[in-house]
Amino acid sequence: AAKYFTHMVLKLEDKCRHIGRNLTLEATYSKPSAELINLWNHQVEMSPRYTARAELISEHEPHRAVMLVMADRRITDTMYHSADEFLDDLRVVQRSLAACGAVRAAYGPVQTIIWQVESFGFHMVEMEFRQHSVVHARALKDIHENGIHGDLQPMTREVIDTFRAIGSIQKRYGKKMAHRYIISFTKSAQHVADVFELAHLSF
């Protein structure tokens, strides 16, 4: 999970920075929208260091400056919490570019990165988990008899560890990266309920 996340974030950073460097549109001739100005003001509050650096190399080029700060936001204290948050900022830039007449930039490179984020998010792949319904039933029986912290069977421990791993992945990289769980040989609603109960007990 970490490998795919790191790979994707670095690729998006490179692409975002490349787009930003090529957005040489002076505010005098390509007036930024109020929405873009608000985004820039938010970036200034969030990181004076990043915005000062972007402004230094993008004087009077607000679209460029905003994109360069977006590219820098992969450090822990400033990084985007989700791909949707990153998409929101990209769309602000796109709408501003389109409104000021820079249609080729808005629906060319900016649209391309938007499609990429919509398709793959920050995760690139979606992990799938699968377990037999009988294993779930046996694990629950074991937990009910011995307690979640009791002397449990190795398979029960494996089931619990799996749910905890899913939770950890979702918390760190987003729910979309690990949101598919398949119950093999499901024959009743109880088999689905077992999974929810195990997930609840695991945390």
Locations of regions flagged by a protein language model:
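A short acidic (Asp/Glu
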Residues: 138, 189-197
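Non-catalytic terminal/interface segments that mediate subunit docking, oligomerization
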Residues: 167, 199-203
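Extended, charge-enriched "interface" segments that sit outside catalytic cores
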Residues: 13-180
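Active-site-proximal loop/turn and secondary-structure-junction residues that shape catalytic pockets
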Residues: 130-133, 185-189
